[in-house]
Amino acid sequence: MKAVWYESNGPADKVLVYGDMADPVPAAGEVLVRLHASGVNPSDVKARAGSRPMGFPRVIPHSDGAGIVEAVGAGVDPSLVGSRVFVRNGQWRRAFGTAADYIALDAGCVHPLPDGIGFDTGAALGIPALTAACAVLRDGPVAGETILVHGAGGTVARLAVQIAADCGAGVIATTGRPERADDVMAAGAEAVIDYRSGNLVEAVADAAAGRPVTRVIDSECGLNLASSIEILAEKGVIVGYGSVLEPAPELPFLTMMFKNLTLSSILVYLLGDEEAAAYAAIVSDMLERGALDARIQKVLPLEDAARAHELVEAGDRAGAVILSTA
């Protein structure tokens, strides 16, 4: 099979290799997927650059992908053969991810991709869409609640806006990119606030118009912790799926305790198969109804993996970067 791999950390154009490798064979409990698309996420490019040590002598990057099940290992339902699926956790604690023609992985890490939904879209779902669904729905239904979603110009947060709105919540969103405000409104937000201007707490209160804000979803949890605590109503929840700019914030425990607040973190790779399947079903249902837009910014051929990594590293994307493996 054709694949992209690296054997040391470093710049994409220096360490990524495009070439031939042996086709994988599904072990017991696994499926073999003929991949048509591979999604490039920030965690993939950070791992390649050296954010953590090499876990294996050779790594095929990327955890997200989409394709067709070609074979199954022992103990797996043979009726899965021929199914269109999207893939998660392709390179989580495993050497060989989705930047290849084939991947063999645990059957619990593939989810049905609805007919009519392209493989490129499927490859954009695993990490971003399941993170967003978990952030919105981990604690149960949100219909009638008012939710604050930070950084809604970003991929995960924009998906969270769509999921929360579709589930019946009122959504207030923030962005540091005012030019994307109309797009965030179109995704389902009732109000969009430029978090760089004015008093954020007051702006959220004005947008909420007396409604209690019960949930804050944030990719920079530590940076915004103080304002999130102030914004939230009693028994509210802060859901953090990142905290790069302030990784070790001071935690005002007593303030949180006297509001009975919950601080919840998400690492999508650690979702159990049943929980992930439940979120995947919600995402698939929204896709079928045309209620979810998993935006694609760029599709490149597999051999251009280095360019794809560079695009993700550059930041300021308005959608996913995908490698075509068809």
Mark where each language-model region is.
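Short glycine-centered segments of the SAM/dcSAM-binding site in methyltransferase folds
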Residues: R84, T146, G170, G236-V237, ...
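C-terminal hydrophobic helical "lid"/dimerization subdomain
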Residues: M1, E274-A326
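NAD(P)H dinucleotide-binding glycine-rich loop of Rossmann-like/cofactor-binding domains
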Residues: P78, R88-G151
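Glycine-rich beta-strand-centered segment in the early N-terminal region that forms part
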Residues: A22-V40, A49-Q91
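Mid-domain Rossmann-like dinucleotide-binding core that forms the NAD(H)/NADP(H) cofactor-binding site
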Residues: A123-S197
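Short, glycine/polar-rich helix-capping loops at beta-to-alpha or helix-loop-helix junctions
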Residues: T98-A99, T175-D183, A248-F253
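Short amphipathic alpha-helix with an adjacent loop that forms part of the alpha/beta core around
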Residues: L200-G210
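Glycine-rich phosphate-binding loop and adjacent beta-alpha segment
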Residues: L223-L292, S324-A326
